[in-house]
C-alpha cells in the first residue's frame, strides 16, 4: 500500500508540474548586437533583465572592439589574472581545438586576419617578410592558462575569441534558463543554436537554413 501511495504522489507531482509548464507563456527576446539574435522560452514571467545582463557580461568578456573588455585588456597586457570562469572555459576549449587540429584553428591569428583586412585594419601591400614578422608572435603554443593567469611568450600576442564567442553566449543563456528550471527554450545567436524541449505548438523545435548550399 505504501509503495502504491508513493507512486501516486510521484505521478501527481509530475502531472501538476506538466500542467503548470503548459499554462506558462512563451516569451521572445530578440535584437541585433554585432549579429542578430533570437531567444524564445516558456516561463511564468519575462526575463528581459536577466538575459540582458548575460549579454552585457558576454560583451564585457569577449568584445575585442571594446577597449574595456577583458579580452582587450589581455591583448594590451593590462590584465593577466582572469577571474571569470566562462572566459577561462572558452580559452581551454580553444586550446583543445587548436591542439586537435594541429594549429589549423588558432585564436592568436588575429594579426594575420588584420593583415588581409578582415579585422581592425588592412595592410596595403603584403610581403612574405611582413607575414614572417607577424608569425613570430602568432601561435597557440605561445600562450597558456596557468590557474587563472594568462601567460604569453610574447607581449605582442593577441587573442580573438569571436569564433567561439557566439556559441558561448548561447551556453550562458541556456545555463541561466536551466538554473530557473525552464524546460522549453530556443536560443539563436549569430547562427549558433541551443534548444531544449518543445515550442509553443507542442512540437520539437524545427531549425531551417535559409540557403542550404555550399558557400552560402
Where are these regions (language model features)?
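Mature catalytic core of soluble alpha/beta enzymes
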Residues: 4-7, 17-216
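Short, linear, compositionally biased motifs with a strong N-terminal bias
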Residues: 10-11
Amino acid at each position: 500500500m505504501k509503495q502504491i501511495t508513493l507512486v501516486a504522489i510521484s505521478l501527481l507531482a509530475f502531472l501538476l508540474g506538466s500542467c503548470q509548464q503548459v499554462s506558462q507563456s512563451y516569451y521572445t527576446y530578440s535584437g541585433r548586437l554585432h549579429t542578430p539574435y533570437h531567444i524564445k522560452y516558456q516561463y511564468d514571467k519575462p526575463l528581459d533583465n536577466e538575459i540582458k545582463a548575460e549579454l552585457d557580461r558576454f560583451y564585457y568578456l569577449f568584445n575585442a572592439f571594446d577597449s574595456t573588455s577583458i579580452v582587450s585588456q589581455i591583448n594590451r597586457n593590462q590584465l593577466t589574472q582572469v577571474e571569470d570562469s566562462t572566459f577561462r572555459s572558452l580559452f581551454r576549449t580553444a586550446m583543445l581545438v587548436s591542439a586537435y587540429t594541429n594549429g589549423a584553428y588558432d585564436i592568436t591569428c588575429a594579426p594575420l586576419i588584420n593583415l588581409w583586412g578582415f579585422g581592425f585594419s588592412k595592410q596595403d601591400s603584403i610581403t612574405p617578410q611582413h607575414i614572417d614578422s607577424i608569425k613570430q608572435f602568432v601561435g597557440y603554443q605561445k600562450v597558456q592558462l596557468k590557474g587563472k593567469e594568462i601567460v604569453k611568450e610574447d607581449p605582442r600576442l593577441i587573442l580573438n575569441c569571436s569564433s567561439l564567442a557566439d556559441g558561448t553566449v548561447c551556453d550562458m543563456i541556456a545555463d541561466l534558463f536551466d538554473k530557473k528550471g525552464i524546460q522549453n527554450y530556443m536560443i539563436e545567436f549569430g547562427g549558433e543554436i541551443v534548444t531544449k524541449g518543445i515550442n509553443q505548438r507542442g512540437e520539437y523545435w524545427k531549425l531551417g537554413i535559409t540557403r542550404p548550399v555550399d558557400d552560402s
